[in-house]
Every structure is written in C-alpha cells, then in structure tokens.
Amino acid sequence: MNNREKEILAILRRNPLIQQNEIADMLQISRSRVAAHIMDLMRKGRIKGKGYILTEQEYCVVVGTINMDIRGMADIRYPQSASHPGTIHCSAGGVGRNIAHNLALLGRDVHLLSVIGDDFYGEMLLEETRRAGVNVSGCVRLHGQSTSTYLAIANRDDQTVLAINDTHLLEQLTPQLLNGSRDLLRHAGVVLADCNLTAEALEWVFTLADEIPMFVDTVSEFKAGKIKHWLAHIHTLKPTLPELEILWGQAITSDADRNTAVNALHQQGVQQLFVYLPDESVYCSEKDGEQFLLTAPAHTTVDSFGADDGFMAGLVYSFLEGYSFRDSARFAVACAAISRASGSLNNPTLSADNALSLVPMV
C-alpha cells in the first residue's frame, strides 16, 4: 500500500460509515481520487465491500505438499553403494508446508491445503504444522494411505547426492477434494501452489484463483513443465536455472540467455520472476520494470536446505505488506539467509523484524 491508501484505511477504521466527500475534505484531495483509492483497496482485498468492512489482515492459501523429510549426511565426500557412518535427521517438510510454516513465523495468516495419510507421520506433521501457527483445517486425512516422504542423502560438504520424493499421495488431492475449500481460496489475498500438485489440481487452482495473485514454486526441473500453459495466470514465479530452461524450452549457457528466457516468460504473462542461482544469489525481474541481481548478505550458514522456501515466504509476505518490487526481493533474500542459519528446515528465529534487520546488508 502507498501512504495515501494507509491514511484512508486509518480513517475508515475510525469511522466505517464515513462518506467519500468527508474523506476528501480531511485529506484535501478530490472525491474522485478518494473513490479511486478505495477501489484500489478493494482490489487489494483491504476493504471487503460496502460499509467499508475492513480486512485486518489478508490471508494466504498454500496448496501443495506436506511430507516427512528424512535427511542423512554421510561422513565422507563421495558416498558409495554401501553403509556409511553419518547422521540422520527427521523433520516436518514439504515445499508447500515449509513455505506456510515460514509465513506463520513471519506473522501472516496462512492456510494449507494438502493431504496426509492416517499414520504416525501424518499425525506428527499436522500437530507440528498447527503448532507453528498454520491453519491445517484444509488438510485431508486419507484412510489406509501412507503420508508422503522425502528422503535425501548428502555428503560431508552438505551437498545432496541423491534424493527420492515419494509424493504419490498428492495424486489424490483431486479437484473434488479441493472443492471443500473453494470459498476459502476465493477470498485469499494470495494463493501459492507448488508443482508437486497434479495437472488436474493445478488447473483447479489456476481456474478458481483467476482474479487472485498466484505465486508458484516450480519445485524441480522434473515438475516445472506442468505450468507451461498457465504462465499467463502467474503473478510471481521462482525457478532455478534448470527449471527456467524447461519453461523457456531452450538451454541457458550465459547471462544473456537467462535474461532472454526471463523476458520470454514476461511476454507470456508472468509479472515477477526471481531466478534462484547456484551461488544463492537471485536474478530479479519485473515485467516492464527493474531487472537486477541480488547476492546473499554475509550471515551464518549452517544448512542451505530449505532456504528457497524461506525466500518464497518472504516474497509472499512482502507482497501482502505492499512492499516495492526491489524491497520485496531484498526482504526475501534476508529471509533465505536466516533460513540458512539453522539446521532446521524452518528456522524458529525467522521473523519480520529479524529479516528487516538484515535488509540493509542485501
């Protein structure tokens, strides 16, 4: 929101029945300008309708994966097909769940739509996600099914050498199941989907959220192709270089190729692109706007696993808060840096204040 919109919201909070001409007199602007600002506030979801009923905080709906993450780190650099000493860690995970968890840490109202099995993992995931502050009433428990699981093996340098993602359960998150949350989704300030969803579920989300800003996490180059025909519906996209190649349809061998690919996606309708690079820097591009590279701030790094989920949560948060494009990018990079400073997928010290304290370093 801009300063004028904030002034109008403050007036409406004090007197929801005030007339537009009275607001105009108070702010010394024309009534038509007041009407235009109010229309903008309604489009942004800050005002629900006549009588100026205010939405105190827009909420986000995340549609995506919730799964158990099992991560093993071998004590050697090149693990072979044998048993190796090392450490194994289990935690709540899933791209959608992790982003929702981070949004809750940042103080946003967030709902998660997903599916779990009726096993121990499913119960543990629901409880931990609920404790984090995420509304999980839209997570459906499927009887006789096993909860999705992600298994990753890393070497002693914390480089993932093998990962297996068993998310077959998500195939049962059908439009029929999702229909129970259609009203919740229709009134969201932002909808975020991850590409673990089936093509049918993605179609349901894109169709129902046609008038709502859509954020998409491509997840991997194996799943990014699912959204190639939905680019015109996407507001914000965060691909890696391999994922960008899939969406563009050509190899990227230089910065010039990357820029051309980004512009091609803009031409197809994507408003904001944040290309996550191997060195943790981010190439940021706004349609008909700025293009720049941001590097990660100097900050403690314990584990990079999950930092991109912190980044995406930062993008959603800053969009809902009305940040500029550049400030949104800087805030998201700061969130990613805080995420890397913990061995946990969701750093419990992540907060809006802590991220803002790092922004000047970005």
Task: Tell me the role of every PLM-derived stretch.
Residues 43-45, 171-176, 216-222:
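Short gly/ser/thr-rich secondary-structure transition/capping motifs
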Residues 103, 240, 308:
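Short, conserved phosphate/pyrophosphate- and ester-handling motifs at nucleotide-, phospho-/glycolipid
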Residues 1-20, 26-27, 32, 36-55, ...:
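Conserved phosphate-binding/catalytic region of the ribokinase-like
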Residues 3-4, 8-13, 18-26, 30-113, ...:
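Glycine-rich phosphate/adenosyl-contacting loop at the front of the ribokinase-like
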Residues 56-57, 78-86, 105-189, 355-362:
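Conserved N-terminal subdomain of the carbohydrate kinase-like
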Residues 87-95, 140-144, 305:
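Active-site nucleophile and cofactor-binding loops and adjacent substrate-binding regions
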